[in-house]
């Protein structure tokens, strides 16, 4: 079969489109996988600080089971201007089974992570903070650990004295969040519907339990994603094992399955699916093969013409 220049060009375009479509859903700049950092102790898409310790094989420890620590990680680039979904694998644990604290937080805020008193993050932030608070300081009659959501306006401080009671716009109990196994947190932001949903699958389970749904949610024009944690007089370790983010569309909302928990459970995203670089390499190799076939066929046709000319 002869490959015309037009056919090869169309095949090349088709291959490029397929490669692009395969990558559009995955947000590499908002995802994190082992080994997390390069040999220069840096990550292209994330920055970290405070007490954060990165174990290239075992995870990112925002704090260890040590008193008076605070650590954070934050994206270098903002979240997309469209709808998106985040699935993150985390663990909260300590040697003590009775006294432990203080908690881990997930932020979608205009500020990148800076050291501060709100679970290791700066106070008076602009955006949304989701706090997994593991110790009840001044909330009698309220079960802890607990997930508490705060909408920051850039001016209002966090209500330290009452574990965020004055700031709380939604919450749910998270009694099973502490333990030896990993939890999965899933956040889904629907920009068109202005909705924000958060779910948790506890202790190795892949069955998500809805924590809250928020309506009329508008993120800051420029929004960064951050995780932070802190310990005080009590302590526990706060670990992030992996983060997977992707864009979502109206079609996804109606029929496309969400990110399956199995993609993170017991492994990291990078061990399950290739990165953009791998996809690009595969695409380039495919194009090379196509053009090699075209060149070979063109050479054969030219040789046949030369042979006929010689015979004549």
UniProtKB/Swiss-Prot annotation:
UniProt membrane topology term: Single-pass type I membrane protein
Transmembrane segments: 281-301
An annotated GO BP: endoplasmic reticulum to Golgi vesicle-mediated transport
Keyword hit for Ribonucleoprotein: no
Cytoplasmic side: 302-312
Signal peptide extent: 1-22
Keyword field contains Chloroplast: no
Compartment annotation: Membrane; Endoplasmic reticulum; Golgi apparatus; Vacuole
UniProt cross-references to InterPro entries, sorted A to Z: ConA-like_dom_sf, Intracellular_Lectin-GPT, Lectin_leg
Domain L-type lectin-like: 24-248
Keywords, comma-separated and alphabetical: Endoplasmic reticulum, Golgi apparatus, Membrane, Signal, Transmembrane, Transmembrane helix, Vacuole
Principal subcellular localization: membrane
Positions in the Extracellular compartment: 23-280
GO molecular function: D-mannose binding
GO cellular component: COPII-coated ER to Golgi transport vesicle; endoplasmic reticulum; endoplasmic reticulum membrane; endoplasmic reticulum-Golgi intermediate compartment; fungal-type vacuole membrane; Golgi apparatus; Golgi membrane
Protein name per the record: L-type lectin-like domain-containing protein C126.08c
Organism expressing this protein natively: Schizosaccharomyces pombe (strain 972 / ATCC 24843) (Fission yeast)
């Amino acid at each position: 079969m002869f490959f015309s220049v037009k056919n090869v060009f169309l095949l090349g375009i088709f291959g490029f489109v397929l490669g692009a479509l395969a990558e559009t859903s995955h947000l590499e700049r908002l995802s994190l996988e082992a080994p997390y950092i390069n040999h220069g102790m840096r990550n292209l898409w994330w920055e970290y600080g405070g007490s954060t310790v990165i174990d290239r094989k075992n995870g990112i420890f925002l704090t260890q089971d040590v008193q008076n620590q605070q650590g954070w990680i934050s994206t270098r680039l903002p979240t997309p201007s469209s709808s998106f979904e985040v699935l993150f694998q985390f663990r909260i644990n300590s040697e003590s089974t009775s006294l432990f604290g203080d908690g881990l937080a997930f932020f979608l805020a205009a500020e990148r992570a800076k050291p501060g008193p709100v679970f290791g993050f700066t106070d008076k932030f602009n955006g949304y903070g989701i706090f997994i608070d593991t110790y009840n300081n001044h909330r009698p009659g309220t079960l802890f650990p607990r997930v508490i959501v705060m909408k920051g306006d850039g001016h209002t401080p966090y209500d330290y004295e009452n574990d965020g009671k004055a700031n709380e716009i939604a919450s749910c109990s998270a009694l099973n969040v502490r333990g030896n196994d990993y939890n999965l947190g899933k956040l889904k932001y629907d920009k068109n519907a202005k909705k924000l949903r958060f779910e948790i699958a506890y202790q190795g389970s892949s069955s998500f339990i809805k924590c809250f749904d928020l309506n009329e949610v508008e993120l800051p024009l420029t929004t960064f994603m951050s995780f932070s944690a802190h310990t005080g007089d009590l302590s526990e370790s706060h670990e992030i094992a992996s983060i997977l983010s992707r864009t979502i569309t109206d079609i996804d909302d109606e029929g496309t399955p969400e990110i399956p928990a199995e993609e993170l459970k017991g492994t990291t995203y990078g061990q399950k699916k290739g990165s953009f670089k791998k996809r690009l390499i595969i695409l380039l190799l495919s194009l090379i093969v196509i053009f090699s076939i075209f060149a070979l066929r063109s050479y054969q046709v030219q040789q046949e013409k030369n042979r006929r000319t010689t015979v004549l």
